[in-house]
């Protein structure tokens, strides 16, 4: 039984060559109670951000942050702060359109210069959901480098061993 919610933070910087394999390994886990945060850290290659948007659109568990380059640690911090409810999100998209990304801005303090936050239309039932967006409550947070991947049952096997652990590196 999957009672624990796992937060997965994946920093992205110029990894178009590896990113699909990484994201496929996460979204295809047998353990499905995941909240996945992708943080594009100012990638300058041609496709990293586009690949991240593609996966965000097709999986409602994914939230994508696009920010100014600041390094892997700032990208991880964005994920931690998101799960802590630090950001006030204001939607830029007024209506939900099928097969589209909903865009949000950060209101107030934005130390990591986050440009836009993206979420799939699949994560919202109606327009009212856009204004009452709530942060997921997670039990554990895991960081995965975007040029890495997980074996199929990785989380399923690891979660029972995580009691008493707050952060897994």
Locate each region found by the language model.
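Nucleotide-sugar donor-binding/catalytic module of glycosyltransferases
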Residues: 1-169
């Amino acid at each position: 039984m999957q009672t624990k919610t796992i937060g997965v933070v994946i920093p992205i910087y110029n990894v178009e060559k590896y990113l699909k394999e990484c994201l496929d390994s996460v979204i295809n886990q047998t353990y499905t109670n995941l909240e996945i945060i992708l943080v594009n850290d100012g990638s300058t290659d041609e496709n990293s951000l586009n690949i991240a948007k593609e996966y965000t659109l097709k999986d409602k568990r994914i939230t994508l942050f696009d920010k100014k380059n600041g390094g892997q640690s700032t990208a991880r911090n964005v994920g931690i702060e998101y799960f802590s409810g630090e950001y006030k999100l204001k939607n830029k998209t007024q209506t939900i359109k099928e097969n589209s990304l909903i865009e949000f801005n950060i209101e107030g303090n934005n130390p990591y210069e986050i440009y836009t936050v993206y979420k799939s239309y699949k994560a919202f039932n109606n327009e009212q959901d856009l204004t009452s967006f709530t942060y997921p409550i997670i039990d554990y947070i895991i960081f995965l480098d975007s040029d890495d991947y997980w074996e199929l049952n990785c989380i399923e096997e690891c979660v029972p061993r995580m009691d008493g652990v707050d952060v897994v590196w």
